[in-house]
Amino acid sequence: MLGVFGSQEIIYMTRQYMAGDTPWNSTPRQLNGRVVFAEHYSMHPGHYTFTQKLGIATKVDVKKMFGKTPAERKKEFAEYSTIRTQSPVGFLAPDFELETTTGETVRLSDKRGQIAVFMFVAMTCPPARTQVDLWKELHEKYDTKDVQIFFIYSRERHAGERGYRELKETTSTSERMTHARMLSEITAVPVAVDPIDERTLKDYGMVPNAAFIIDREGFLVFKSQWADIRKIDQVLQQLLVSEELNKTNQG
């Protein structure tokens, strides 16, 4: 498998593998009177296995990534950094109203009384594609009366590159919906579509594969720059346990 890569690509993947995951404290804390969790930030998906990273590298043009100009890198870094400033943990999450691939409407404020969990995805975002099957398992694990899990389809990330030759950049909401329906064909997790103006992505941070957890009252309690099913599951379990403890104490 390594034979398909050049020397720069091998160096890139080795750095990714050696870096590993960045530290994350899973202990819940109180903020503004509610249970919240530490954010997880990283410029690279360090929690993926080496095999997963190899799979990701087969889908993208690593040389193109290396060939970005300083201005392009600066813009990319600025966009990725918005996840740190947009929609802070412990505060009311920005509301949104999005159409799903089945013609229904997903409105975050309608999820009050339930925990909402979502990840930004795209057909040409290999880290997100790596997570899709894992999120299906998570979707099946939790009762929908308590936890609502869904994807938000946003901008394409590696359109036309090595693993996605047939997929082009979307220039309209209808084109984005077409790509989102392709994703719906390979997952049972509901897929909502962010319009081409990217209003939802801008509200939550311009990151390709970020994940968010909103509590029953509509407050953001966890966000991760790269979706990691293990962290998501851990936070959900602790949230539900905390709710049960509160009920017991109040009873």
Where are these regions (language model features)?
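Structural microenvironment flanking redox-active thiols in thiol-disulfide oxidoreductases
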Residues: R129-E185
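Short loop/turn microsegments at loop-to-beta-strand junctions
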Residues: A93-P94, I115-A116, V207-A210
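Short, solvent-exposed cationic patches
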Residues: P127-D133, D203, L236-G251
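Short, ordered coil/turn segments that flank beta-strands lining enzyme active or ligand-binding pockets
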Residues: T101-T102, R216
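Short active-site neighborhood of thiol/selenol oxidoreductases, capturing the structured segment around
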Residues: V106-W135, Q148-F151
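Thiol/disulfide oxidoreductase modules built on the thioredoxin-like
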Residues: E185-V189, V193-V235
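N-terminal targeting signals for export/organelle localization
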Residues: M1-E97
